[in-house]
Design a protein with these regions (language model features):
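A short beta-strand-loop-beta hairpin characteristic of the jelly-roll/cupin
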Residues: 59-71, 225-241, 329-330, 336-356
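Short acidic-glycine-tyrosine-enriched beta hairpin
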Residues: 235-247, 252-256, 348-367
Length: 384
């Protein structure tokens, strides 16, 4: 059976007050609306038409809801979490752990007796959080380390006072040392460095680094004593166009800046932060999970059949574009369908749910193919 989901909107301070309401076709209430969660994460599970949460239904009978193979492979846990994400302000500089790192970190936090909902707890669960974000409008982000020669060229072009040692570190290939030094610097030392960077950015004339200049100017003004501003110097600054994507495996350092997107991740809430945030920051733990291999080309596009190929073992995602026709999406395992434009009918063996933009539906593991009809665009997320 395919059923409609009722989803929770998270009101994190960085959220846009207008982007999600506009997508949903409702009046904004003036408050930030950052993320709409679709899935069975215990923090904010979707609700089924009968009032049960998807988390409770999965917990009661994983094999019936997920299918026997998926239930066994993911230890009875719903494998993925989907979100609509609307960033009005920058999110934190962050990375996510691998499965082994998450298990180890979770066991350490449990042994230390840190409550699972404590602000200073790093590992909320024992699962990794690889994720993909697909832009629904132009979306700005910092993603992965820029190749070192490009970062040296950026620093040479800006020539901020006091950054000579950093530039030399990068020329010598010492990215880990440079990132760790930046993120570990106290705020009294950071403030004049951010000030010098802001002055250099204001005086920069040229178009080779226009996106970088725009972002650094805003970060220097908004976070004058935050080491995350300096870390931003080291990351790829990208702008995704509609339906472009970025895939973030374990260890990828990133920060979303602004825009509306559809996001899918493994079913985890493990985030290790290093800056650009008022939330808990743990630099040594962040550095311990970071992948310091530079990322040359972060942008991912869909294949001809609409599939975004990530290789992630926790989920698969396909975009379906319809112009009055029908598409049969084969597959097994639990699926979430989210309409992002127009009106889509999502059906299974016994039922059909009509979805408008921002609405979603769930099909259980044994349901069989999912049939989509209508005019618009939708994402179909399934277990890998």
């Amino acid at each position: 059976v395919v059923v409609r989901l009722q989803n929770t909107i998270r009101d994190y301070a960085w959220g846009s007050p207008t982007a999600l309401p506009e997508l949903l076709g409702v009046e904004p209430d003036g408050k930030p609306q950052a993320e709409m969660w679709m899935g069975a994460h215990e923090s904010a599970p979707s609700v089924l038409p009968n009032g049960d949460t998807l988390y409770d239904v999965v917990s009661d009978d994983p094999a019936a809801v997920l299918g026997e193979e998926t239930a066994e492979r993911f230890e009875g846990r719903f494998p993925f979490l989907a979100k609509l994400l609307a960033a009005g302000q920058p999110l934190s500089i962050q990375a996510h752990p691998s499965r082994d790192q998450a298990i180890d970190g979770y066991e350490r936090d449990e042994a230390a007796g840190i409550p699972r909902d404590a602000a200073d707890r790093n590992y909320k669960d024992a699962w990794p959080k690889p994720e993909i974000l697909i832009a629904l409008e132009p979306f700005d982000a910092l993603v992965g380390f820029r190749p070192l020669d490009r970062t040296v060229a950026l620093l040479d072009a800006l020539a901020p006072a006091g950054f000579e040692a950093l530039t030399n570190q990068l020329r010598d290939g010492k990215l880990r040392e440079a990132f760790t030094d930046f993120m570990s610097t106290d705020r009294d030392t950071i403030r004049p460095l951010v000030g010098a960077l802001g002055e250099a950015v204001a005086q920069y004339v040229g178009d080779a680094f226009e996106l970088e200049r725009e972002t650094l100017a805003k970060l220097c003004a908004d976070f004058p004593d935050d080491p995350g501003v300096l870390a931003a110097l080291l990351l790829n600054r990208i702008r995704l166009e509609r339906f472009d994507a970025v895939y973030l495996p374990a260890g990828n350092v990133h920060a979303y800046l602004r825009g509306l997107g559809f996001e899918v991740m493994a079913n985890s809430d493990n985030v290790l932060r290093g800056g650009l945030t008022s939330k808990y920051v743990d630099v040594p733990e962040l550095v311990s999970v970071v992948d310091f291999e530079p990322l040359t080309d972060p942008v991912l596009t869909a294949e001809a059949d609409g599939v975004y190929e990530t290789g992630c073992p926790y989920f698969a995602i396909r975009r379906v574009d319809l112009d009055g026709g029908e598409r049969v999406v084969e597959g097994a395992g639990p699926r979430i369908v989210c309409c992002v434009a127009g009106t889509i009918d999502a059906g299974g063996k016994e039922s059909v749910v009509t979805l408008s933009a921002g609405q979603s539906a769930f099909a259980a593991g044994p349901e069989g193919p999912c049939i989509l009809r209508g005019s618009g665009a939708a994402f179909v997320v399934s277990a890998r």
